[in-house]
Each structure stands twice: as structure tokens, then as C-alpha cells.
């Protein structure tokens, strides 16, 4: 779990997201509170509940981007799900408890990686021995092995092909629910894994080069050194105490006033979410998981519905409300120039792979921001995503002809932008800009 202060979390988010300080501060405080709670006495720790957040704002202003960046910062089990993917219990589809089961799988992956790093040195030594076995045989004399070991460490044998045996990894085959036992999701491969382990583990022979064999062998050796039961226990504990669930598109399951149709199913999903957000115990194949201290961050555009259309009980379980503002021309300009991986930097780097030197003047950046704002106001406001449409249109010809213009220098100015995008009023083919 991250130990960043709220100020550090906000400054980290500032590298990728322009504006929206209220939302950044809210998630920064919530993330820091996870760490603060861990410092308390055990008696008080159980009483401190996370303050769940509801982010409200139009599309394309940074709600989902905040969640993506938060996931990398958190250093804790984090899952982002769309509320629309779930159905009420009894209907065909995924029930909301699957969110927690998926979160536990993510937690296991995180803990496993951490444990692998702890035993990496030992695993590397084991991998080296296995490579030597493949090169000179297990019965070779110590002198021969030492001679090859020196060559191996010097990189002289990197391109030599060898046959190695590695443990079979599951290929993600689908699972099935056991009727009458929610949460007891058994994958087809889980069963074969059980039989494989009972017979000493399943392996497969792979032909590869010495250099590329190390990754598989180190992973293999690491897995032998770590205890899966410990990983599962730690993962469940990590999910219960530090887990974060980001519920996107929550406005799509709100009952719109006077709306007809699938209202019952929508309300059912909300009712199923209630115990999850409030605190319940979910059965998973790794044991029961309590959701009392999992942080839930919900977000939605609320274009056609409003937060008050959500069930009152669910509203009460999302006590912190943050409104994200629509983007202005100045915001668009900053998005193009100030963010760490801005679109302009991306396109300059992409064209540089073709030895094409691309440059944007200050007035070109102003023109791009201006066009994006005008298109958003006249067609459909899709926020910062509009910039991708505009940039793609402006650089359409350059991208196509780039391989034939290697070594050239191309300057993009406002005239070039206007010429290729055209004034909104004069442009008849508006469909190009509608995503």
C-alpha cells in the first residue's frame, strides 16, 4: 500500500490529468486514510470505515483517468468495473459479488509478484543450474560446469538453443458455477491443476534460447520457493483492508424519473450493491472475504439521470460527492502541452520512428484547442476525447505519407490546422467528428 501524502498523490495525478482538483483531493485523502487506519490500535481500526466517493461529471473530463492512475499509485488490490455489466441475482449475467472474487484474484497476483521478488536471487541461482543441466547435462564434471558457467555469465551462450522443462501455466479456460453454491466458481483447469499437483506437477518441454529461457525458469523456480497458502491468506487480508473498487457508469443503473422498461433489473443491481458497499461477507474459492473496509469509488456522467435517482440507501453509502467541471479552451491547451504523455508528444514520437521531424507552433496548439471546444459545443460534448479526433484528422495526410518523407521537417501552424479541420460552420461533413 502506498505511503504517499495527499499532496504527493495530487501532484502525481497532476502529471497526467489537468484540473479537477476537488476530485484529486478526495481520492488522495481516501487513499491516505487507508494508511492512517493501519496505524491505529486494533480495537479502533475495525471501527474506522472508509468514506466512499461519488464522482459526478460529464464524459471525458478525467473520471476514468483518475481511476487508472490511482490503480498504479495505490500499490493495493484495485479493480475498475462498469456497473452496467452486472445483473440482479436471478437474472442471466454476472452478479455483483463477482467484483470481490475478481478483486481477490488481483490481490493474489500482487502478493505473488511481491513474493517472487523476495526470492528472486535464489530463483536466479536455481535457473542458472537448470540452464547448465540443459547445456552440459546433469552428470557433467564440476570443472566442465564451471567452464560453461563463466561463458554463460559472460553472455557468450545467449543465442544457443536449449530444451527446458517448465511448469504448465493455465490458459485461462472458462469456469462454471456449481448450482446452489454461489461463489464456488470452478475453472476447468482448476481440476486438472489439482490432479497435476497430486502427481508432482505438470510440465512441458520448450525449445528456446539461453537468454529467453531465464524468464520462464526464474518464474518456475520462484513458484517452487513460495507457499501458495501464505499468498492466499495475505491476499485475502490485503483485499479486506486495502482493496479499492472503482464503479464506473453508475448513472446507467439509476432509475430515471418516469422511465419505463428495465427499471426492476436496474433497481435490483443497486439493491445487490448495497450490502457489498455497506459491508458483507462474500464467499470465494480462497475463503470468505469481508467487504467492510473496501473503499468504493463510484462515478457517472448523470446526463439523463441525477444522483438523487439512485436508491436513497445507496446514496447514503456514498457520502463524499465530488463534481468534475467541464473542460475549457485553456484546459484543452494544457492537456495538449503539460501532461506527461500528451497527444502532441505522442505524435512527435510516433513520427520520429519514421525519421520525420514534427513540430507544432503555439498558434497551432491554440487552434487545436479552439476546434475541440467548438466541436464539443456544436455537436456533442465528449470532453478531452475530442482532441484525439481532431489530432487524427489534422495529421491524417502526414501519418499516411510519413514513410516516404523520412528526414523531412514538418511544421504545423494554425493555418494548417484550419485547412485540415475547417471551420465548423463551413464543414458539411460533420460525421467525421462524431465518435
UniProtKB/Swiss-Prot annotation:
InterPro entries for the chain: AAA+_ATPase, ATP-dep_Clp_protease_ClpX, ATPase_AAA_core, Clp_ATPase_C, HslU, P-loop_NTPase
Location relative to the cell: Cytoplasm
GO CC term, one of those recorded: HslUV protease complex
Positions with a binding annotation for ATP: 18, 60-65, 248, 313, 385
Domain of life: Bacteria
Record's keyword annotation contains RNA-binding: no
Listed SUPFAM superfamilies: P-loop containing nucleoside triphosphate hydrolases
Keywords: ATP-binding, Chaperone, Cytoplasm, Nucleotide-binding, Stress response
Main location: cytoplasm
Annotated GO biological process: protein unfolding; proteolysis involved in protein catabolic process
UniProt-recorded Gene Ontology molecular function terms: ATP binding; ATP hydrolysis activity; peptidase activity; proteasome-activating activity
NCBIfam families named in the record: hslU, PRK05201.1
Functional description taken from the UniProt entry: ATPase subunit of a proteasome-like degradation complex; this subunit has chaperone activity. The binding of ATP and its subsequent hydrolysis by HslU are essential for unfolding of protein substrates subsequently hydrolyzed by HslV. HslU recognizes the N-terminal part of its protein substrates and unfolds these before they are guided to HslV for hydrolysis.
Family the entry assigns: Belongs to the ClpX chaperone family. HslU subfamily.
Subunit structure: A double ring-shaped homohexamer of HslV is capped on each side by a ring-shaped HslU homohexamer. The assembly of the HslU/HslV complex is dependent on binding of ATP.
Protein name, UniProt field: ATP-dependent protease ATPase subunit HslU
Source organism of the structure: Allorhizobium ampelinum (strain ATCC BAA-846 / DSM 112012 / S4) (Agrobacterium vitis (strain S4))
